[in-house]
């Protein structure tokens, strides 16, 4: 039986990593072997753990290239969990397809759009393959409504790949994004 791909996406501060960690916990409670991964570029909260903004975390294999995932997969691995997929190369698509064909469920969390509202290529590729998509929202940093679907960069230049947290990014709704972008 083929594995299933679940994508958890949305803006920053929407609970993507928290949701990913809840799926890890479900698999562990079911005594299923898991493999958890994060990109080396993301060391915001911990160098070897996936950690949510709320502080919950789990140990992870830290990798630079998607192909490295294969060396950590064992015969009895049932679930693969990958955080911050937007930071990986598009080669992740082929790795995930291979895992699914081997009957392994894959859960990926990551941003769908850059702060300029451009799609992250790797996330977009994975979305095209997904069996289930969980699109998260956040509370808008400006108006306070639970309708934020975008991430706005408020410090640190215009680079689209720029790892950071609350010192650089806020979650905003589309109306507030447009209002705030006019000021920048």
Curated annotation (Swiss-Prot):
GO terms for biological process: DNA biosynthetic process; thymidine metabolic process. Disulfide bonds: none annotated. This is Thymidine kinase. The active site is at residue 84. ATP binds at residues 10-17, 83-86. Its EC number is 2.7.1.21. The lineage of its organism: Bacteria, Thermotogati, Thermotogota, Thermotogae, Thermotogales. It catalyses: thymidine + ATP = dTMP + ADP + H(+). Its main location: cytoplasm.
């Amino acid at each position: 039986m083929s594995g299933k791909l679940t994508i958890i996406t949305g803006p920053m501060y929407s609970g993507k990593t928290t949701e990913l960690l809840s799926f890890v916990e479900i698999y562990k409670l079911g005594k299923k072997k898991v493999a958890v991964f994060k990109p080396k570029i993301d060391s915001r909260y911990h160098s070897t753990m996936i950690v949510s903004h709320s502080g919950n975390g789990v140990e992870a294999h830290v990798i630079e290239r998607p192909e490295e995932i294969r060396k950590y997969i064992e015969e009895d691995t049932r679930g693969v969990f990958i955080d911050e997929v937007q930071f990986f190369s598009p080669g992740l698509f082929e790795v995930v397809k291979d895992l699914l064909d081997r009957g392994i469920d894959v859960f990926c969390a990551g941003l769908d759009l850059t702060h300029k509202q451009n799609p992250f290529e790797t996330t977009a590729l994975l979305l095209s393959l997904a069996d289930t998509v969980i699109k998260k929202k956040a509370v808008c940093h400006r108006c306070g409504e639970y309708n934020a679907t975008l991430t706005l960069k408020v410090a640190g230049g215009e680079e689209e790949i720029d790892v950071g947290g609350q010192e650089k990014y806020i979650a905003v709704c589309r109306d507030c994004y447009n209002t705030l972008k006019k000021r920048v």
